[in-house]
Regions:
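A short beta-loop-alpha structural element at the N-terminal edge
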Residues: 3-17
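A short helix-loop-beta-strand connector motif used in the catalytic cores of GNAT acetyltransferases and
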Residues: 40-52, 79
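Conserved beta-strand in the GNAT
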Residues: 52, 58-67
Length: 154
């Protein structure tokens, strides 16, 4: 049974609460009003694609993907940036359904693939992603330059 669909602006109140839980999970301060503004901007500006999982009319999880492009390959990819399922609903297949939505978005948009990163210590994710067909990409190093002024303020 399919429990997932594309998010709409009508989902913002519930989605912002889930997004806030996700951010708190990653040790960020709770800020539901800012979460709602951030998500509203993503949806209205079509900056990302967001899919939600629901049970009995309540949102229990979401996945957010951003479009990226490879110049050398001359193609689009989707960056699976955020995946979250409320702790009371984990282990019930919602993450897999949300990942399937991401893969279907890739197929429908004729993108070359879905990319993601996860921490080496994320045992659940490091089991989930290969089980969903993702392959660990060992042929590159991932580097980050962080704008310390902005990072220190967030």
């Amino acid at each position: 049974m399919k429990n997932t669909r594309k998010a709409t602006s009508q989902d913002l109140v519930q989605l912002a609460k889930l997004f806030d839980q996700y951010r708190v999970f990653y040790n960020k301060e709770s800020d539901i009003p800012a979460a709602e503004i951030f998500l509203k901007d993503r949806i209205e500006n079509k900056d990302s694609e967001i899919f939600v999982a629901e049970k009995d009319g309540r949102l229990v999880g979401f996945v957010q993907l951003y479009p990226i492009f490879s110049s050398t390959r001359m193609c689009r990819y989707w960056l699976l940036n955020d995946l979250y399922v409320n702790e009371n609903h984990r282990g019930k297949g919602y993450s897999k359904e949300l990942i399937e939505e991401a893969k279907e978005l890739c197929r429908l948009s004729k993108a070359s693939g879905v990319l993601l990163e996860t921490g080496k210590s994320n045992d659940i994710g490091n089991q989930l992603y290969p089980a969903c067909g993702f392959e660990l990409y060992n042929s590159v190093n991932f580097y980050e330059w962080a704008n310390k002024q902005l990072i220190n303020d967030k």
